A protein has these predicted regions:
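Conserved alpha-helix/loop element of class I SAM-dependent methyltransferases that forms part
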Residues: 1-18
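Class I SAM-dependent methyltransferase SAM/SAH-binding core
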Residues: 21-71
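A conserved beta-strand element that flanks and buttresses the S-adenosyl-L-methionine
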Residues: 83
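A short His-aromatic
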Residues: 89-90
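A short glycine-rich, Lys/Arg-flanked "PGG" loop and its adjoining helix->strand segment in the class I
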Residues: 95-110
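Conserved class I S-adenosyl-L-methionine
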Residues: 112-134
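Short alpha-helix
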Residues: 140-156
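Conserved Class I S-adenosyl-L-methionine
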Residues: 155, 159-226
Length: 226
């Protein structure tokens, strides 16, 4: 998640802010990009203290906060931009997360959001989420575009921009990113060997002599205002 046009877009959407928070910052790439876009104060927030430390160390000028995405330690209307990039599929209660963002972003402020999304077809949705959980047990769920837009609107956000992009993933690199064990790799491969009808086409699966070589997933980008 270190770079890409999608990262640049999220940072640009936040660029008019004076104080921004990057929620579930991970290694801090998004927080660093927002700081680079000209925002004076950027807080890198994550539930894992070691991730906050990494983010602050890698981006001088970024502040750190250990924070649960669904219980943010900020007062109401205390930031004028919030971002969350490719992390929300780990959250147990996404509606509560969106409501928390709405609480801390001031009226007129921006929420720049990106996450993996599932197809509307229930079988393909279940296939994608099964594969993701077998790869990474911390994966909770990739939701649909409709789910996310509904949660945002219910929390009082106005949807300004939406875009769904498709990213091709190298299969071995994708597994290696989470240091998947041999057993997890076996279970992921088993799912790809017995997919529901239409999955190979929906996820642009390519195979070779040794099995899956690549597949694609979709990501939703949203710019919303409070």
């Amino acid at each position: 998640h270190r770079e890409g046009d999608d990262l640049d877009r999220l940072a640009t959407w936040c660029s008019d802010a004076d104080r921004a928070v990057d929620i579930a910052t991970g290694a801090g790439h998004t927080a660093e990009a927002i700081l680079g876009a000209g925002v004076d104060r950027v807080v890198a927030a994550d539930a894992a203290p070691e991730m906050v430390a990494t983010a602050v160390a890698s981006a001088p000028g970024v502040e750190g906060a250990v924070a649960d995405a669904e219980r943010l330690p900020f007062t109401e209307d205390s930031v004028d931009a919030a971002a969350c990039r490719i992390a929300a599929h780990h959250f147990p209660d996404p509606a509560a997360f969106v409501a928390e963002v709405a609480r801390v972003v001031e009226p007129g402020g921006t929420f720049a959001f990106e996450d993996n999304v599932a197809p509307d077809d229930d079988r393909l949705d279940e296939f994608l989420n099964t594969v993701e959980r077998r790869r990474d047990p911390t994966h909770v769920r990739s939701h649909t575009v409709t789910d996310w837009l509904t949660w945002l609107e219910n929390a009082g956000f106005t949807i300004e921009t939406t875009d769904v992009i498709t990213k091709s993933l190298d299969y071995e690199e994708w597994l290696g990113n989470v240091d998947a064990s041999a057993e997890r790799r076996r279970r992921v491969a088993a799912a790809f060997e017995d997919p529901p009808d239409g999955a190979a086409e929906a996820f642009s699966v390519t195979t070779g002599d040794d099995g899956v070589e690549s597949f694609a997933n979709r990501k939703l980008l949203v710019r919303a205002t409070r």
